[in-house]
């Protein structure tokens, strides 16, 4: 589930807080009376279709619950959600990003800790790094479904260039210099010369060696591994401009401006998504979130995954939004049932498919029990290429810290000022 930078407009909604009083569990309904709950979410075309089919299965299993689905593009999501809240039409259940914690402080959403017992859940069921808390005792819940930053690539581009595939084990990870060298070999001009060739034409490139997302999730694993941070050591100032962090950002800029192995921001904005760019051989590698795996599976691309090019102090994180339940709901039990359905990797065949393609589980047992790992991460599955368990599952589980957007208060507002787009 991809999150985008979204403008936070909650201050204007403070006067609306009175609209949202804590709602007890829905009154007992007659067995034939149908409850309708509204669920707002975002996602690509493939994710939208998957959610629609998943919710259809939920309604088949729960015939007394009707789910009103509202798909909102991620870039418009918070604006639309704020408007719904202001109009007294908040959804019952919703996707959310880092702004959810402000909603928690404003009393708009349930403290998930208060719902655990009712849903038969325990905090210990979940990875410890994945809780969206706005205070030590108040939480918007665990991540709904994990994603992580990863290196994706087109296998055919590597084979055609005679270049070894990216390593899948942390102990064999490329150094940054090795990564740049590989990217040069994979960057081709219209005459077929690579970026290491002295006659390479940087003004006429047909295949880039690497592209990368421009949000925080791409550069932060490298900054954390280098000993830098999003905030400074005093935790009251920005750390991205300290020496270690600045060098990492410079490294990414050099891919564009010095080595010409990655497109400029203007060029990238005119190019397609990660899956399409890889499938079309517009780029040989792409560093971004694992949410791209579903689209890659459907793209027809011969693709693979590798560990990030970090050869010392490998540090990364799981991340993702959480499903939030609004206090204004008149159907708490129905909302809890939908929550449990969407977050249980084994609730239905369609949900299982989501956790085998688009999402990754957040429950600890799916990273520690070999049978549970194979259930969703078997490399026989079409969205789990060879090396997936080492490069994605093990590398992230063994080296995860709390994701920056979960760990930094007011992250949404800060990140809007730092968004390198």
Language model segments and positions:
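Short, well-ordered beta-strand elements
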Residues: 33-44, 65-70, 92-93, 140, ...
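Short, solvent-exposed loop/beta-turn-alpha elements that line the ligand-binding surface or hinge
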Residues: 113-126, 168-172, 200-209, 228-248, ...
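Extracytoplasmic/periplasmic solute-binding protein
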Residues: 135-144, 149, 159, 175-238
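Short, low-complexity disordered leader/linker segments with a strong preference
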Residues: 1-38, 60
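Glycine-centered hinge/linker elements that transmit conformational signals in sensory
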Residues: 180-184, 234-267, 297, 308
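Hinge/lid segment of periplasmic solute-binding proteins
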Residues: 97-150, 177, 196-204, 212, ...
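Extracytoplasmic "Venus flytrap"/periplasmic binding protein-like
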Residues: 54-126, 156-166, 276-279, 284-285
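Mature extracytoplasmic/periplasmic domains
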Residues: 57, 294, 321-409
């Amino acid at each position: 589930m991809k999150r985008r930078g979204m403008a936070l407009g909650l201050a204007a909604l403070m006067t609306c807080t009175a609209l949202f009083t804590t709602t007890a569990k829905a009154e007992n309904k007659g067995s034939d009376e149908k409850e309708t709950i509204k669920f707002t979410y975002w996602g690509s075309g493939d994710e939208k279709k998957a959610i629609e089919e998943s919710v259809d299965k939920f309604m088949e299993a729960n015939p007394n619950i009707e789910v009103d689905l509202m798909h909102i593009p991620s870039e418009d999501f918070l604006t639309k959600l704020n408007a719904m809240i202001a109009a007294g039409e908040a959804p019952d259940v919703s996707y959310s990003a880092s702004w959810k914690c402000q909603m928690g402080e404003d009393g708009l959403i349930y403290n998930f800790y208060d719902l655990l017992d009712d849903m038969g859940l325990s905090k210990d069921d979940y990875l410890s790094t994945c809780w969206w808390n706005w205070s030590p005792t108040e939480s918007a819940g665990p991540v709904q479904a994990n994603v992580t930053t990863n290196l994706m690539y087109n296998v055919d581009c590597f084979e055609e260039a005679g270049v070894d595939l990216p390593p899948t084990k942390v102990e064999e990870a490329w150094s940054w210099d090795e990564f740049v060298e590989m990217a040069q070999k994979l960057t081709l001009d219209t005459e077929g010369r690579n970026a290491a060739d002295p006659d390479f034409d940087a003004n006429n490139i047909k295949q880039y060696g690497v592209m990368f997302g421009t949000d925080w999730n791409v550069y932060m694993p490298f900054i954390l591994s280098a000993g830098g941070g999003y905030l400074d050591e005093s935790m009251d100032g920005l750390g991205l401009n300290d020496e270690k962090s600045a060098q990492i950002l410079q490294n990414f800029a050099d891919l564009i401006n010095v080595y010409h192995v990655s497109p400029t921001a203007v060029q990238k904005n005119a190019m397609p998504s990660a899956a399409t760019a890889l499938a079309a051989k517009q780029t040989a590698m792409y560093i971004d979130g694992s949410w791209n795996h579903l689209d890659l599976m459907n793209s027809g691309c011969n693709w693979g995954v590798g560990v990030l090019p970090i050869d010392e102090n490998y540090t990364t994180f799981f991340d993702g939004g959480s499903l939030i339940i609004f206090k204004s709901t008149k159907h708490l039990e129905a909302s809890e049932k939908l929550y449990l359905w969407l977050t249980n990797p084994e609730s239905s065949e369609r949900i299982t498919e989501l956790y085998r393609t688009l999402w990754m589980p957040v429950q600890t047992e799916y990273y520690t029990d070999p049978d549970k790992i194979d259930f969703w991460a078997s490399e026989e599955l079409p969205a789990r290429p060879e090396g997936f368990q080492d490069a994605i599952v093990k590398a992230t589980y063994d080296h995860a810290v709390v994701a920056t957007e979960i760990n930094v208060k007011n992250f949404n507002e800060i990140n809007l000022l730092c968004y390198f787009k």
